């Protein structure tokens, strides 16, 4: 037998040994995940923008300036009017990157953000995959590139932003609340060490929100939500963490802390004009509608209070019905709406919003299929085939909107170009992401019993236990 034939047969035998025991569907799933990663990359190329770690250059330049003995909030990035705007604790946390080149700091942030996104999606998608009988690795493998293609995530990567790291801190508390509700410390952790029992018991819930608030003030709205829903221990942990970190920062960097809280915090013009297209908050919408660089103050305050009441009220109802994920999502989206500045890369809570809508569609369809077999039950002709269709369509539409991100083709800047230069359609597109999150705050559905976060018995938790037992 020729040597070439023998070599080919040896290679085939090696492949068979390696692939023996691997299910063919596993190979198919790996191929699908690879295809989705490639499609996500093409989407980023098609709809993303040129990224050069613009924000990371500001952070890096500011901490290098500070480490050289200068005042942190005196730094201005060359060729811009922008400086460091975060609380001083964020400056301390970023200080180690002063020893790195800016490109290295940017790529480390990208890798850390991807890891944070993967961990969060594992926690959020895992229960859905388990209920539907999908391999968790496959579901997460699809979710990560799909999320990476959206406007908030790709902008966070490209600008060197910290949004996904803060997102992970906040969602860690939601997972801790999940563990508290399940009481895992009472059964599955017996025999483990005290550190493991403490961690998986969820007793530290609130620390993530407290740390996030110390780095950026907008997560403080989650503390308000915790107080509103009477989750006292978690709220106290969050407040204690934020105060403890802030006081410790005063000890280490007293001058910068005093200047930030007495001066820099109130200088809203440090981050840019309200009407800038990437500002997809309510304030940005109103400024653009008025074709002004400034937001009409009283009108913004009135509508902000209304959206705050709607968002927190709906979040509290979602919590009471046992859906903590939707409650957290509503609070995050409400913070985006009412903040004076919410750049498009801040809108990361649209990711769990898509998941909530998709899961609501799956749950409704599953329930309809179960009911369709009940004898004597009269149902509409569309039942169950189209049940959950509107939630699925909303999930797909929301996802496509945040992948395509139609704000950029209609970007305008005063006084050179009016925000009405492209007519009504252009104005709608320029405000489309903001309008979407406002609509989500008002209409995002919750799923009773899906994510309970109670310390004792409650109707929602009792319902969930019965459903899981069945």
Predicted feature residues:
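Perimembrane helix-loop-helix junctions
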Residues: 221-243, 360-364
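The feature captures the transmembrane alpha-helix scaffold of multi-pass secondary transporters
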Residues: 203-207, 396
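Loop-to-helix entry and N-terminal half of a specific, functionally important transmembrane alpha helix
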Residues: 136-146, 324-332, 369, 373-376, ...
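Primarily membrane-embedded glycan-assembly and transfer machineries that use lipid-linked glycans
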Residues: 2-203, 232-347, 419-427, 446-470
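Hydrophobic/aromatic-rich transmembrane helices and adjacent perimembrane loops
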Residues: 344-359, 433
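Transmembrane helices and adjacent periplasmic/lumenal helix-loop junctions
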Residues: 209-226, 338-349
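Aromatic-enriched
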Residues: 45, 358-362, 376-470
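Hydrophobic transmembrane alpha-helices
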Residues: 101, 116, 216-219, 353
